[in-house]
Amino acid sequence: SDLLRPQLRDRQARAGQDALPGTRHTLRHLAATADHDLCTLCNQLAQPLHKIFMESETYRAYQTIKIFTEFLGAESFAGLHKQADAKKLILFDVLAEPFGILGPEQFVRDFGHLPSARVVYRGKLTGAFAEDVRKNKYKTAEGVVCKGGKGGADLWMMKIKTDSYMQKLKQAFADKWEDYWE
């Protein structure tokens, strides 16, 4: 990552940003985040994940396991990060090949003790729940990702963002705000 830093700083300076933007369509490798303490962040999850994957007969049977995390700090917004802000990794999905992405119950059971996405609701996905999310009843920074099914081909997901997050996106990105929306 040391070789990437000068190039990233130049690109960030030209864009007037503290960090590279990410969107719902963009996966970014941690090395692309430049000056953050990557080893510490990765090790916070790597050691307990390795233990789970090695000790569980279920996980040892998979060909490949990929984890998906959100990289963020208290001042992060829409994939932009403040350099001085302390960052963390939050686990939100595990892909076990060839099965697919784990279902929500298995994810919470196996990984809920790690820094992971907070469960705000369990139950049927209803219009009333969606409206509660939009009005920020659950006090989230952006909104929620709803998941259901057992996992793999049976898994479904959908995002619901808060009205206040939508307003922040419109202020920050004008006509491109929908690139960062649900």
Task: Give the role of each language-model region.
Residues 1-182:
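Core nucleotide-handling region used for phosphoryl-transfer chemistry
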